[in-house]
Amino acid sequence: MALSSRARAFSVEALVGRPSKRKLQDPIQAEQPELREKKGGEEEEERRSSAAGKSEPLEKQPKTEPSTSASSGCGSDSGYGNSSESLEEKDIQMELQGSELWKRFHDIGTEMIITKAGRRMFPSVRVKVKGLDPGKQYHVAIDVVPVDSKRYRYVYHSSQWMVAGNTDHLCIIPRFYVHPDSPCSGETWMRQIISFDRMKLTNNEMDDKGHIILQSMHKYKPRVHVIEQGSSVDLSQIQSLPTEGVKTFSFKETEFTTVTAYQNQQITKLKIERNPFAKGFRDTGRNRGVLDGLLETYPWRPSFTLDFKTFGADTQSGSSGSSPVTSSGGAPSPLNSLLSPLCFSPMFHLPTSSLGMPCPEAYLPNVNLPLCYKICPTNFWQQQPLVLPAPERLASSNSSQSLAPLMMEVPMLSSLGVTNSKSGSSEDSSDQYLQAPNSTNQMLYGLQSPGNIFLPNSITPEALSCSFHPSYDFYRYNFSMPSRLISGSNHLKVNDDSQVSFGEGKCNHVHWYPAINHYL
């Protein structure tokens, strides 16, 4: 029965084949197992012979255990011949420098900035290699490869990196960075620390400066390659890593996530703290104490203000030499703490009960009284006296330019001991403006009316019998007199129980200068 062409196509004969064709294929199929057995036996003999030949040198070599800090990978056995085999068989070790800092970053989650122009890594990859042949030449290179094919995002509320999706790294051509010292002898490589601090990361896919091209928000890890120099390979001319004769090392703690701006604030603080090139971002107030200490060593001081709330004050009657830093009851005055030798505050005021100036009425005519005081740095606790000119000399004076200044010695502003002199003739008193202290190492500071620091022909260092300290300079300070001093209603109590009031016309405020210059 004849079959149609369509039925013949689906027949058993068409699917299985004719018997004549099957008979011709049978002897070929019968010969194939015999050939397979022969080839398998020859391969087994070759393997046994090669294993027997390599067994002796392998027994003599020490067993190499994988390093805990680095993982090594080797290229294929072909290409470099004996040189590649020797490189692979050698126990080459590589140690990461600064591993503690890398681990600290890794615990938080290392982030690396990438920019169009290229950004250097911090921390940078720095390694130390051992086990190289001192006489051979080696290249050392580094590349950065993705850890996985995931894209990440930073979750701020949990401070963690989360997977945001998959990505494709095939669009980026992998690059590697050859160390500038390559090629170099194994002895030189083992003697120095190999640093890749000049390598830069970029996200510019069109970069032509040799930077490592990466994608943002991805995880990468750097790998360090040790390549033995061969005559057929010139790493300075090629742009990709050779696949033969290479030993590769990588470190778990050097993994990082690429970002265009730091996401974790802890990473930002740690990089600012540890990166010497980030000092511009540090808090300038940390060095403020050191700068203040340097400024304190200079001889100048900032301007200060004297606040005379009330000019009158009470002192112990009949005791002209009593210190005003102690009150009548014997308790220490607030001035004692304000004017201690160790306290040089730029702002202070004199309380009411601590500024006592016992003097007779005749010593305060209607004249201008410029005020000077003297600090004696060597006699800290010695109370210096105050001696005023004779009343006749003060009464005959009409202007402040012909008056001797009212001198008051203050030992380091620790006390204000003031006395008056009732004995002696007017001629002696007119020439004696100030009792000379026992100290010879002194300095004069003045509160003077506008003009010269000392009145001409009124007082000289020889008349004072004191020498000026060579390390001090004169500086000028201005402050205004308070209104309470001008129109105050308080009185000055003197030793003979008499009172002098500004309102009685003894010291008319018209003759007082509204401002007094403080020369320091």
UniProtKB/Swiss-Prot annotation:
SMART domains attached to this UniProt entry: TBOX (SM00425)
Tissue: Seems to be expressed at a low level.
InterPro entries, per the entry: p53-like_TF_DNA-bd_sf, T-box_DNA-bd, T-box_sf, TF_T-box, TF_T-box_CS
One of the GO biological process terms: cell fate specification
GO molecular function list: DNA binding; DNA-binding transcription factor activity, RNA polymerase II-specific; RNA polymerase II cis-regulatory region sequence-specific DNA binding; RNA polymerase II transcription regulatory region sequence-specific DNA binding
CDD domains, per database record: T-box_TBX22-like (cd20200)
UniProt superkingdom: Eukaryota
Protein localization: Nucleus
Pfam (any one): T-box
One Gene Ontology cellular component: nucleus
Region of interest called Disordered, as start-end residue ranges on this chain: 1-91
UniProt DNA-binding region: 96-283
Coarse class of the protein's main subcellular location: nucleus
Biased composition (Basic and acidic residues): 33-49
Biased composition (Low complexity): 67-84
UniProt KW keywords: Deafness, Disease variant, DNA-binding, Dwarfism, Nucleus, Transcription, Transcription regulation
Disease: Cleft palate with or without ankyloglossia, X-linked: A congenital mouth abnormality characterized by fissure of the soft and/or hard palate, due to faulty fusion. Some patients also manifest ankyloglossia, a condition in which movements of the tongue are restricted. Complete ankyloglossia is due to fusion between the tongue and the floor of the mouth. Partial ankyloglossia is due to a short lingual frenum or one which is attached too near the tip of the tongue.
Protein purpose: Probable transcriptional regulator involved in developmental processes. This is major determinant crucial to palatogenesis.
Protein name per its UniProtKB record: T-box transcription factor TBX22
